[in-house]
Amino acid sequence: MNNDERISKPMSWVTTWGTAEENFIATPEGMPRPLEDTTVRQIVRVTTSGDKMKLRLSNRYGKSDVVIRSMHVAKQVKADQSAIDMSTDTAVKASGSEEILIPAGEVIETDPLDFRVKALDNIAISMYFGAAPSAADQMTGHRGARATTYQVSGNQVATEIFSSPATTTSWYFLADVSLMSPAGSKAVICFGDSITDGFGTDWAVPGKRPDTYTRWGDFFAERLQANEGTKHISVVNKGIGANSILGSWPTDSGRDRFKRDLLGHDGVGYCILLFGVNDLLSLSDTGKYDRLIPEYQKMVALCHENGIKIYGAPILPFGKSQDHTEAAEEVRTRINAWMRSPESHMDGIIDFESALADPEDPKSILPKYAPLDGLHPYDGYETMAEVIDLTMFA
């Protein structure tokens, strides 16, 4: 289906940006000042184009209601600044009201609004808070935004540029942004851990900084938009740092959050699964293989039951990591062999492993890609995106 044919057919909602919800119990030092009577401006990058938008707001981990007294969306002027394009500043409502209530434990949708964006635009979402939790274990958001969030006192949702704001690099109460999209448009869920979440693309690594959009998913989105046949495909990053398939720290385990992260968005057509390395760190025996394979099988089955194609990405080598063991290497090798086999029922393989492995030491990532710890290939994220076959999404 070409673009003209898509536009002529009925349109539907498709998620253009999203993040993996978690609580902040692991990093309470990363919290902003108390939220009540402050404005928080958060920056997200949409991955497709459209002119009608809605947002999902989440209080999934909250034990009390969140009250947003006023909320606006606008285009950001420059990637590392709080300034907005005032000609685009638009109020956001839910159920017809400018004051938005997010009940404890719930996720809500805003009303649709007219707001034109181009793919890869940065938008600023400004929230003026009334009641809001401040305890880390009751806050819903995402620690590793890799983008700057700005906080100032009072109601400044329509202020062009903040003066001396407090800053963090996390998102708060945002779940996703969807656009009314042409027929055939689909979202890709990138499901994983810190490698998908983009560890190493901000202050965690000397010389790096946030607001650069250099996660592998960011480069992938840019490639999709540069190719005429895939401009209708959006990218939704569902990576969480330190997350594992079986373990429930620092937030819900991969197996527990997969269904909601897959099906909780609009228009999902694909899933890229790069997950499991944290389950193997410091492994002393090979028994985890028999525990992990059934979880992968459940993920594949859930995708297929819902008409979603799932592409497996074999677990990356980490032989130069301090947490590498021979048992871990054996399990990694066996999992990857299973994933590549017909028995896995994957719809295809995205071979990040071969692209990053050291030819002289295949159990390790090339040092130039993961110089800090041999585990996170933050200097190889662009290489990862380049090996993805775009015809898998055309």
Regions found by a protein language model. Name each.
Residues 296-304:
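Surface-exposed amphipathic alpha-helices with a cationic face
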Residues 281, 316-394:
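Catalytic His-Asp segment of secreted/periplasmic serine-dependent ester chemistry enzymes
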